[in-house]
Structures are given as structure tokens and as C-alpha cells.
A protein has these predicted regions:
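S-adenosyl-L-methionine
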Residues: 76-109
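Conserved beta-strand signature within the Rossmann-like core of class I S-adenosyl-L-methionine
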Residues: 133-138
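A short SAM/SAH-binding and catalytic strip from SAM-dependent methyltransferases
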Residues: 101, 110-122
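Conserved SAM-binding motif I beta-strand of class I
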Residues: 66-72
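Conserved Class I S-adenosyl-L-methionine-dependent methyltransferase catalytic core
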Residues: 1-38
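Conserved class I S-adenosyl-L-methionine
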Residues: 36-46
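A short, conserved alpha-helix within the catalytic core of class I
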Residues: 119-131
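Conserved SAM-binding loop of SAM-dependent methyltransferases across substrates and taxa
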Residues: 47-63
Length: 138
């Protein structure tokens, strides 16, 4: 985005994809547990546009307490995302570097998302979400 909040034309496709994903999350929000803090995992989070947007939707717009973990292979990207999260004082957001197969969440996720995961990461994300019996997988 530009300083005035305009989406750059080179990023308009990604912007539309993330907004569509947020529509999906909004549509299934009632299927997520309402009696506790939601546990969310974003596999292959990359620069975490979806991770931050999901947090905003759940925590700020839907007023649903949530704890979100973004996982990605690239340590440099994870460090940048963690820095941004810390600067924004988003304590319920955390980022980890690693492989999907080696990730162990603090508690079973209610929502697992994965947008454009590379190689076999989409298959790995689906398999892991099913194994954890996540309420919703997108």
C-alpha cells in the first residue's frame, strides 16, 4: 500500500485474495468455538499479510479472543513478522520458523489456514489439520 492507503496495482491480486479469504473466515466464524480463546495456525505464512488480517478480523472486528501462530520456513521473513507484531504490541500473534511436519502447537488449533503454500506444504497443512481435528481448514 501507499502512504495514503491505496493498494499498489502490483499488489491488487494479493489484496483481493486475502480479502476473499477473510470472507471465508467470516462465513465460518460461527463454527468456531465461542467459549474460549481461538487457536489459529497459518501454515506457510510468508510475509503474513493473511496472518495479520485474520487477527484483525477475529480480534478487532468479530471481537473473538484468539492466539495466532504463523509458521514459515524462512527465518528472515519470520523475524520480520515477529518484529512487526512486537512493534504493534500484538501479543496474541507469534511467528515460528520451521516445517509443518515438525510443528507442535501449544494447544490443538481450531482454525488452520494456508494460502499459497509451496511444494507439498498444502498437502502437509491439510494432513496436519485433519490429524489435529481442527474445526475449520481453509
Amino acid at each position: 500500500m501507499t502512504a495514503d492507503g491505496t493498494v499498489r496495482s502490483s499488489h491488487s491480486r494479493k489484496f483481493r485474495q486475502i480479502n476473499r479469504f477473510l470472507e471465508f473466515i467470516n462465513d465460518v466464524a460461527d463454527a468456531l468455538p465461542a467459549d474460549r480463546t481461538l487457536q489459529v495456525v497459518d501454515f506457510g505464512c510468508g510475509k503474513s499479510y493473511l496472518t495479520f488480517a485474520t487477527h484483525h478480523l477475529l480480534a478487532r472486528l468479530l471481537l473473538r479472543p484468539c492466539r495466532i501462530t504463523g509458521l514459515d520456513r524462512r527465518t528472515d521473513v519470520v523475524a520480520t513478522c515477529q518484529k512487526i507484531s512486537s512493534e504493534l504490541q500484538l501479543t496474541e500473534l507469534q511467528f515460528q520458523a520451521g516445517e509443518i511436519s515438525g510443528f507442535t502447537p501449544e494447544s490443538p488449533p481450531d482454525l488452520v489456514v494456508s494460502l499459497h503454500a509451496c511444494d507439498t506444504a498444502t498437502d502437509d497443512a491439510l494432513a496436519q489439520a485433519v490429524q489435529w481435528q481442527a474445526s475449520v481448514v481453509l
